[in-house]
Amino acid sequence: ITGTNGKSTTTKLIGDMIKKHNISAFVGGNLGKPLLDSLLAKKKFTHHVIELSSFQLELISSFNPKISVLLNISQDHLDRYIDFKDYINQKKKVFTNNKTGYNLISLDDTYCKNFYKKRKIINKISFSTKNKNADIYYNNFKIYNNFFNLNKKIKINKISRDLNGDFNYQNILVAYIVSKILKISKKIFLN
């Protein structure tokens, strides 16, 4: 999971959800535990939910996730990169080696939307709180699913006050998509 903002919240949401589904998961990366802890752990994990910063993506040469997520891109860390284009190129690396998995991309961000349109990315799934044409769309406490089930609506009755706001609705959409890919029940997703 990468993006300028929202990585930690999305990583935690997905990590909590898949653990409730009794999936053995390492949750960390830029958030909490370093990824190296997963490799050194006595317990072997079947899944990894990893928050990746642009700094970590710089070092990736072979990385083939089952699910890649790009939340948003805005001007940040420009002191580290040659220019903004270089920063964007680092963020795009989350998809570079994903040849068989799913690639989740927000349409609410101009840079991500352009990337979604221009790049030939396999198995891409768009999500949005603003664009009704996205594969997965959120509006007025409903998720509209046009990817897994055409015109399917899921009503969300309660959302924690901590998760209000468009950016958090995006995080919820990503968790929903992951729940569908991993065949996690609607009940666990809603909880």
Where are these regions (language model features)?
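Phosphate-binding loop of NTP-binding sites
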Residues: 1-107, 111-122, 176-182
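Adenine nucleotide phosphate-binding catalytic loops in nucleotide-utilizing enzymes
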Residues: 82-85, 92, 117, 121-191
